[in-house]
């Protein structure tokens, strides 16, 4: 199990990303638009830099929903390889069976 504080910190980051997503996208579009004057683009980049760091999507870490483990994460299932193996062998994940040949 991951530390509860690390999992909670990641949840707060996810919420902050959702809260600032529209504002960040709007400012980023202004900064990237070559048709807008350089002064306006610079103002937008300053405003973008003033946003909280944790509102950036890259600061969020994919974590297992079951254990909170940050590594060996399967995106489709939103869980780590260890949780996948444990829950799959018990039969809690539909369509997952232990292979044998």
UniProtKB/Swiss-Prot annotation:
Function: Binds 16S rRNA, required for the assembly of 30S particles and may also be responsible for determining the conformation of the 16S rRNA at the A site.
Family to which the UniProt record says this protein belongs: Belongs to the universal ribosomal protein uS14 family.
One Pfam family from the record: Ribosomal_S14
Assembly and interaction partners: Part of the 30S ribosomal subunit. Contacts proteins S3 and S10.
GO annotations of cellular component type: cytoplasm; small ribosomal subunit
The encoding gene: rpsN
Name of the molecule in the record: Small ribosomal subunit protein uS14
GO molecular function per UniProt: rRNA binding; structural constituent of ribosome
HAMAP family for the chain: Ribosomal_uS14_1
Keywords of this entry: Ribonucleoprotein, Ribosomal protein, RNA-binding, rRNA-binding
GO biological process, one term: translation
PANTHER family per UniProt: 30S RIBOSOMAL PROTEIN S14, SMALL RIBOSOMAL SUBUNIT PROTEIN US14M
InterPro entries tied to this protein: Ribosomal_uS14, Ribosomal_uS14_bac/plastid, Ribosomal_uS14_CS
């Amino acid at each position: 199990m991951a530390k509860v504080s690390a999992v909670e910190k990641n949840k707060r980051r996810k919420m902050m990303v959702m809260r600032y997503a529209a504002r960040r996208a709007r400012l980023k579009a202004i900064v990237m638009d070559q048709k807008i004057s350089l002064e306006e683009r610079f103002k937008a980049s300053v405003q973008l830099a003033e946003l909280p760091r944790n509102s950036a999507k890259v600061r969020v870490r994919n974590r297992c929903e079951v254990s909170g483990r940050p590594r060996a994460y399967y995106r489709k299932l939103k869980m780590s390889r260890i949780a996948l193996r444990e829950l799959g062998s018990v039969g809690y994940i539909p369509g997952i069976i232990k292979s044998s040949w």
